[in-house]
Curated annotation (Swiss-Prot):
This is Ribulose bisphosphate carboxylase large chain. The modification N-acetylproline is found at P3. The active site is at K175, H294. The basic functional RuBisCO is composed of a large chain homodimer in a 'head-to-tail' conformation. In form I RuBisCO this homodimer is arranged in a barrel-like tetramer with the small subunits forming a tetrameric 'cap' on each end of the 'barrel'. The lineage of its organism: Eukaryota, Viridiplantae, Streptophyta, Embryophyta, Tracheophyta. The record marks K334 as: Transition state stabilizer. It is found in: Plastid, Chloroplast. It is an enzyme of class 4 (lyase). The modification N6-carboxylysine is found at K201. Mg(2+) binds at K201, D203, E204.
């Protein structure tokens, strides 16, 4: 090597391995308004100090690597490194703690949820010094929020499009979710919408299979929507699942839905990914479509208490990436959801400003700076007896989705839809009159059965159905 091209180490460089905490544990650091803040539940290997484990998380999810490198001298680590700035114990867990990490905003590409996750959780979860790691929450700074479009329409625009106010929206997933022909599927959609539902839904398992290709389903569902609208005088919709094996195919399905004039399409945002979801959300905004989001695969990521990622993080990411509805559990049905925690991330989806509240699992105050809100969808094992609790828990800005609780009605799909609509209207009226839904809910439903035989039949069928299992998370 000639003298002109030879590169020598600077005087300050010293090769070798040193503790992460010497560089990345900074308890005196004052967080900035522009920092992305993360709360990790850390379970270190035996013998690894909390400060070292927290610093390792900060390092490996930002600028650090396992050994000192001479190119550190070519940049400013103080400007770009993540910092573990606080550690606190987890009540009742001697081997776990919460590590708070601050990331400079310059580490992240504008408007890119996928790269935010690539940086923060992409590599560090396999780190050998940790037995387990869970991302509990993120604080997204206003400066970064403003680089995202968010939901294609938002709650208020959706209500204006549908001309429906003052109550939750009602939906239904068509069952059986697999095996119906397109024509029979469309018939079920029509019956449910005619009976009083606002929406029906493709199950996430439905895309384009030999028994029902997507184009045929879209056509028969559109026919059902227009027929039900003509008969009821209400705007109706069906969540047409645009999820596909390629982004090109996904967009083709969304374009066809727009050409049919239907109001809403659907997407499985976790299985397909944030890049595809953001692309579809942008198309929906530009073309006046609502976007319903299913969270298929979420429990693979969020169900374990000490490893993975809490759903509140996935919910925040969805609001940034774009979606007008997202499934959020029920609290009372067959799918998991503890009340305070569920309402914590429901508020993160809907509200513009949310205060820190650890009792609801909210680690950071979050300001969405007018990013449109997302309607939470309560779905899974719910029926008419749950209506008072669902109305009281989720309030007006929600979608209450009854699949088996509609199509399982002994008289058929349309009477099942009637039963749900009557139950909802009764609960909303009782609430508006000042009655206590939590205490008087069953009485309110029984009173409504006197003038709705459809509701009376539904109440008789599901009077003994309960799903009583403890929640996994707290």
């Amino acid at each position: 090597m000639s003298p002109q091209t030879e590169t020598k180490a600077t005087v300050g460089f010293k090769a070798g391995v040193k503790d992460y905490r010497l560089t990345y544990y900074t308890p005196d650091y004052e967080t900035k308004d522009t920092d992305i803040l993360a709360a990790f539940r850390v379970s270190p290997q035996p013998g690894v100090p909390a400060e070292e484990a927290g610093a390792a998380v900060a390092a490996e999810s930002s600028t650090g690597t396992w050994t000192t490198v001479w190119t550190d001298g070519l940049t400013s680590l103080d400007r770009y490194k993540g910092r573990c700035y606080h550690i606190e114990p987890v009540a009742g867990e001697e081997t776990q703690f919460i590590a708070y990490v601050a990331y400079p905003l310059d580490l992240f590409e504008e408007g890119s949820v996928n790269y935010m996750f690539t940086s923060i959780v992409g590599n560090v979860f396999g780190f050998k010094a940790l037995r387990a790691l869970r991302l509990e929450d993120l604080r997204i700074p206003a400066a970064y929020v403003k680089t995202f479009q968010g939901p294609p329409q938002g709650i208020q625009v959706e209500r204006d499009k549908l001309n429906k106010y003052g109550r939750p929206l009602l939906g239904c997933t068509i069952k059986p979710k697999l095996g119906l022909s397109a024509k029979n599927y469309g018939r079920a959609v029509y019956e449910c919408l005619r009976g009083g539902l606002d929406f029906t839904k493709d199950d996430e398992n439905v895309n384009s299979q030999p028994f029902m290709r997507w184009r045929d389903r879209f056509l028969f569902c559109a026919e059902a929507i227009y027929k039900a609208q003509a008969e009821t005088g209400e705007i109706k919709g069906h969540y047409l699942n645009a999820t596909a094996g390629t982004c090109e195919e996904m967009m083709k399905r969304a374009v066809f839905a727009r050409e049919l004039g239907v109001p809403i399409v659907m997407h499985d945002y976790l299985t397909v990914g944030f890049t595809a979801n953001t692309t579809l959300a942008h198309y929906c905004r530009d073309n006046g479509l609502l976007l319903h989001i299913h969270r298929a695969m979420h429990a693979v990521i969020d169900r374990q208490k000490n490893h993975g990622m809490h759903f509140r993080v996935l919910a925040k990411a969805l609001r940034m990436s774009g979606g007008d509805h997202i499934h959020a559990g029920t609290v009372v049905g067959k799918l998991e959801g503890e009340r305070d925690i569920t309402l914590g991330f429901v508020d993160l989806l809907r509200d513009d400003f949310i205060e820190k509240d650890r009792s609801r699992g909210i680690f950071f105050t979050q300001d969405w700076v007018s990013l449109p809100g997302v309607l939470p969808v309560a779905s899974g094992g719910i029926h008419v007896w749950h209506m008072p609790a669902l109305t009281e828990i989720f309030g007006d800005d929600s979608v209450l989705q009854f699949g088996g609780g509609t199509l399982g009605h002994p008289w058929g799909n349309a009477p099942g839809a009637v039963a749900n609509r009557v139950a909802l209207e009764a609960c909303v009226q009782a609430r508006n009159e000042g009655r206590d839904l939590a205490r008087e809910g069953n009485e309110i439903i029984r009173e409504a059965t006197k003038w709705s035989p459809e509701l009376a039949a539904a109440c008789e069928v599901w009077k003994e159905i309960k799903f009583e299992f403890p929640a996994m998370d707290n």
